[in-house]
Amino acid sequence: MSPKTHTLSVLVEDKPGVLARVAALFSRRGFNIESLAVGATECKDRSRMTIVVSAEDTPLEQITKQLNKLINVIKIVEQDDEHSVSRELALIKVQADAGSRSQVIEAVNLFRANVIDVSPESLTVEATGNRGKLEALLRVLEPFGIREIAQSGMVSLSRGPRGIGTAK
């Protein structure tokens, strides 16, 4: 059986060293973290980690149990596409001289992305969406020449009233 992609929302205490301990746990077990985003929550003393990892179900259950044993981990929820919304952010610098600029902008607009910087030889594009949308945009922009990409990790929230329970 091949590994599948899992998205974990991990609510943690906002203290020094917590990220290092969580990442070390994945590393010790031989997991490669595909995407990691960490940020503030509505509670000032807590942070949310969104971790995307490829794993079979049994090893993932084991690592989830071990994560729960870490003193600063408050709660872990596995997100799925049906019950959550997820987004990534990409900044893409595309080669675009005066001759190709309008074509690049037209492609960017099809993906509801935004041009956030213009120079004589390039455009910088800001795009948000799921991984599939961002990969499709990159394929469309590839023929123009992609100079640079900076991409965030995935962030994810449960749909509707369901959540990780960060409110005190």
UniProtKB/Swiss-Prot annotation:
Domain ACT: 7-82
Pfam families, A to Z: ACT_AHAS_ss (PF22629), ALS_ss_C (PF10369)
CC terms in the record's Gene Ontology section: cytosol; peptidoglycan-based cell wall; plasma membrane
Location in chain, cross-link Isoglutamyl lysine isopeptide (Lys-Gln) (interchain with Q-Cter in protein Pup): K44
One of the GO biological process terms: L-valine biosynthetic process
Signal peptide: none
Entry-linked PROSITE patterns: ACT
Keyword Transferase: yes
Keywords: Amino-acid biosynthesis, Branched-chain amino acid biosynthesis, Isopeptide bond, Transferase, Ubl conjugation
UniProt gene name: ilvH
Pathway(s): Amino-acid biosynthesis; L-isoleucine biosynthesis; L-isoleucine from 2-oxobutanoate: step 1/4; Amino-acid biosynthesis; L-valine biosynthesis; L-valine from pyruvate: step 1/4
Function noted in UniProt: Catalyzes the conversion of 2 pyruvate molecules into acetolactate in the first common step of the biosynthetic pathway of the branched-amino acids such as leucine, isoleucine, and valine.
Subunit structure: Dimer of large and small chains.
Record organism: Mycobacterium tuberculosis (strain ATCC 25618 / H37Rv)
GO MF terms held by the record: acetolactate synthase activity; acetolactate synthase regulator activity
Catalysed reaction equations from the record: 2 pyruvate + H(+) = (2S)-2-acetolactate + CO2
UniProt EC number: 2.2.1.6
Annotated family: Belongs to the acetolactate synthase small subunit family.
Keyword Ubl conjugation part of the UniProt annotation: yes
Protein name: Putative acetolactate synthase small subunit
Induction (free text): The expression gradually decreases as growth progresses.
Top EC category: transferase
